[in-house]
Swiss-Prot record:
This is Histidine--tRNA ligase. The gene is hisS. Homodimer. InterPro entries: aa-tRNA-synth_II (IPR006195), aa-tRNA-synth_II/BPL/LPL (IPR045864), Anticodon-bd (IPR004154), Anticodon-bd_dom_sf (IPR036621), His-tRNA-ligase (IPR015807), HisRS-like_core (IPR041715), HisRS/HisZ (IPR004516), HisRS_anticodon (IPR033656). Its EC number is 6.1.1.21.
Length: 420
């Protein structure tokens, strides 16, 4: 029997893991700069947290992993981060705290979709949710943070695409106008769009089907149905983005994929080799009713998410590295059991002072050990043989200059601290 990974998943090997750790560290540091606190929620939720009795997105309908536990309770692996964060916000009564709640998250999500390049059934996301304010300034800050996350990584021509769906009243008026426009040509729409016309008509604007694209060329658009309050909100967001010199483009057909969005929706784009027109790296938007739907008080929110696999792929395509080449500080070369025991003792002392060190564990000869030291690009090699043991010294060799000196075992730590 072959034991292989589950379809749509992947292994992160040690060389790749360093890139993941570097990106995670970068993201956490940036969120901290903006005064966001990390929240960690379970990877599975009771299904009613995900499958709420409102309009369901295509993703929730088709792509979630649902199962029953041994007590016959319905559970769902989280397909995205927002629902679990809001559930936790309500359950833990974070809304009782004064002021705005600013949260960020990072972790795996699960969707049963067709695996393809850049798309997986288990995938990593990071994102944020800001709860408790209707002010356009929060929209602008969240967009700023999303933009800066990508811009500071060094990707080219980073920009924001955004739109407004308006408040509930504006969105309802637009939704009906779109249904009225498309119903006469329903039979000409793709199968997916025909299904969406009933439960999620706004997503038809995002269709990639050529027939759909032609049919919606003259469709009504959300911006044309904004009431005065919604228009003022969107204008204020644009004004603040202008003040921060954040480049943006109004995309009148941008709706995003989740049904709870209202008012501002946005995506972050960058020019990336090989990505072509599919250069959106992440996005999000504002929501008005999600907290209330999950049992909390009437609380507005806004958030975004980025797929980490896609972002790491973009960095690789552009030749941007977040890590330095892996390099040991020292590598011990020994010749027998006694010298190996002494090396292990010395190595423990060095490691306790955060000096990166390793030793051979295969009882190999000098040449294989030397080859291993050079493979790890070790800065120094420490050689211990019978003579060194008898005299309580080591041979310390600089691999760059090839200079070799004799150092007392008692002063080895201090010597290395000076040299490293």
């Amino acid at each position: 029997m072959n034991y292989i990974k589950v379809k749509g998943t992947y292994d992160v090997l040690p060389t790749e893991a360093e890139n993941w750790v570097a990106l995670e560290s970068y993201v956490r540091k940036l969120f901290k700069t903006y005064n966001y606190g990390e929240i960690r929620t379970p990877m599975m939720e009771y299904s009613n947290v995900i499958h709420r009795e409102t309009e369901l997105s295509d993703m929730v309908i088709k792509e979630t992993y649902n199962f029953k536990d041994k007590s016959d309770r319905d559970l769902t692996l989280r397909p995205e981060g927002t629902a679990g964060v809001i559930r936790s916000y309500v359950e833990n009564k974070l809304y009782a705290q004064a002021g705005v709640t600013k949260l960020y998250y990072m972790g795996p999500n699960f969707r049963y979709e067709r695996p393809q390049k850049g798309r997986f059934r288990q995938f990593m996301q990071f994102g944020c949710e800001v709860l408790g304010s209707n002010e356009p300034s929060i929209d602008a800050e969240v967009i700023e943070l999303a933009y800066e996350t990508i811009y500071r990584l060094g990707l080219k021509q980073v920009s924001v695409k955004l739109n407004s769906l308006g408040d509930d009243a504006s969105k309802a008026n637009y939704r009906q106008a779109l249904i009225d426009f498309l119903t006469p040509v329903k039979d000409k729409l793709s199968k997916d769009s025909q299904d969406r016309l009933t439960h999620n008509p706004l997503r038809i604007l995002d269709s990639k089907d050529t027939a759909d694209i032609e049919l919606i060329k003259n469709a009504p658009l959300p911006l044309d149905y904004l009431n005065e309050t919604s228009k003022q909100h969107f204008d204020s967001v644009l004004e603040l983005l202008n003040l921060m010199n954040i480049p943006y483009e109004i995309d009148r057909k941008l709706v995003r994929g989740l049904d709870y969005y209202a008012h501002t929706v946005f995506e972050i784009h960058a020019t990336i080799k090989g990505f072509g027109a599919q250069n959106a790296l992440g996005g999000g938007g504002r929501y008005q009713n999600l907290v209330k739907e999950l049992g909390g008080p009437d609380t507005p929110g806004i958030g975004y998410a980025f797929g980490m696999e896609r972002l790491l792929s973009a960095l690789e395509q552009e030749g941007i590295t977040l890590t330095s080449p892996k390099q040991l500080d020292v590598y011990f070369i020994t010749f027998d059991q006694q010298s190996r025991k002494k090396a292990i003792q010395l190595q423990h002392i060095l490691r306790s002072e955060n000096i990166l060190s390793d030793i051979d564990h295969l009882n190999r000869g000098f040449k294989p050990q030397l080859k291993e030291a050079l493979r790890y690009d070790s800065k120094f090699i420490i050689i211990i043989g019978e003579n060194e043991l008898n005299n309580n010294v080591v041979q310390l060799k600089n691999t760059k200059t090839e200079e070799q000196v004799e150092v007392s075992m008692d002063t080895l730590l201090d010597t290395l601290k000076e040299l490293l």
